[in-house]
Amino acid sequence: MGWNHRVMKHKDGEDDFFQIHEVYYDKNGKVDGYTANGTTAGGNSLDELRSELQRMIDSLDKDVLIYEE
């Protein structure tokens, strides 16, 4: 089990938009859930914030997931 940041594609009528979500995985590595809303970056120090932002940037290199309500 674990989690990471992933880009998710949303539908807004006929338009698509993309947000970064926290995605959670089961013990087999399959998606088990994700945050209802896109996530924001934060941290208790600039280094933590930098690390969080880097994980978000890294998510741009992974396959885009489809957001389903």
Residue positions per predicted region:
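Low-complexity intrinsically disordered segments
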Residues: 2, 46-69
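Generic structural signal for short, flexible, solvent-exposed coil/loop and linker residues
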Residues: 9, 13-14, 29-30, 45, ...
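Generic, ordered loop/turn and secondary-structure boundary motif
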Residues: 25, 32-35, 66
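Short N-terminal "domain-start" leader segments
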Residues: 1-28
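A short, exposed loop/beta-hairpin motif centered on an aromatic-Gly-Thr core
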Residues: 32-45
